[in-house]
């Protein structure tokens, strides 16, 4: 919204704005609105160095099933985006048979219950005395990420996962539980993607590691 106000006031002449803010200029003849395709993606990045996920990483597939990505695209991006199931930019060379976690709330609950989670009286799953509860951190100043995180938390609570979105000016990477990541691989995926998900790579804030 701040950029929109700056554009309207003449303080700035060019800016990248959200799809919602872009609506303020589509009928204004003094502005030209360009739709730009990007390789950006957004997703929940788990901190696998955190003890909670070391104990409960088997709940992550259920979390993926519980999130309606298309609803996020439609409501937050006003349809200006596509559903993503991985970090690589979609193109004609993609393998369309990759593992996908399409929106399926019933499947989410099934995965949890098979793994030994039981639904508590408060509507939240628990196991061994521990609630399935975690916080998704969002960097301050990005309304799109904040909105995506809020919708994800709402959808997760509908299946019995107590997720909370927290907007912060500074992120404690080592001690956080999860983060609403924003990244992209517009060119060489070996460079842009492995630095985030490769074992011991400099930008691998999640501690993710897969020998395969």
What do the PLM-derived regions correspond to, one by one?
Residues 20, 38-39, 49-51, 68, ...:
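Solvent-exposed coil/turn segments that connect beta secondary-structure elements
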Residues 73, 164-171, 192-212:
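Extracytoplasmic/peripheral linker and loop segments enriched in polar/acidic and small residues
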Residues 1-50, 167, 178, 182:
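Extracellular/periplasmic solute-recognition and catalytic clefts
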Residues 55-154:
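Append "and occasionally in soluble cytosolic enzymes with long acidic Gly/Pro-rich linkers
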Residues 28, 34-58, 83, 129, ...:
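Short, solvent-exposed loop/turn segments at the edges of secondary structure
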Residues 11-13, 29-31, 55-60, 68-72, ...:
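Loop/turn elements at helix/coil->beta-strand transitions in domains of secreted/extracellular proteins
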Residues 147-168:
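Long, His/Glu/Asp-enriched segments that create or flank divalent metal/ion-associated functional microenvironments
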Residues 3-4, 21-22, 59-60, 72, ...:
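Short, hydrophobic alpha-helical packing/hinge segments within bilobed ligand-binding/sensory domains
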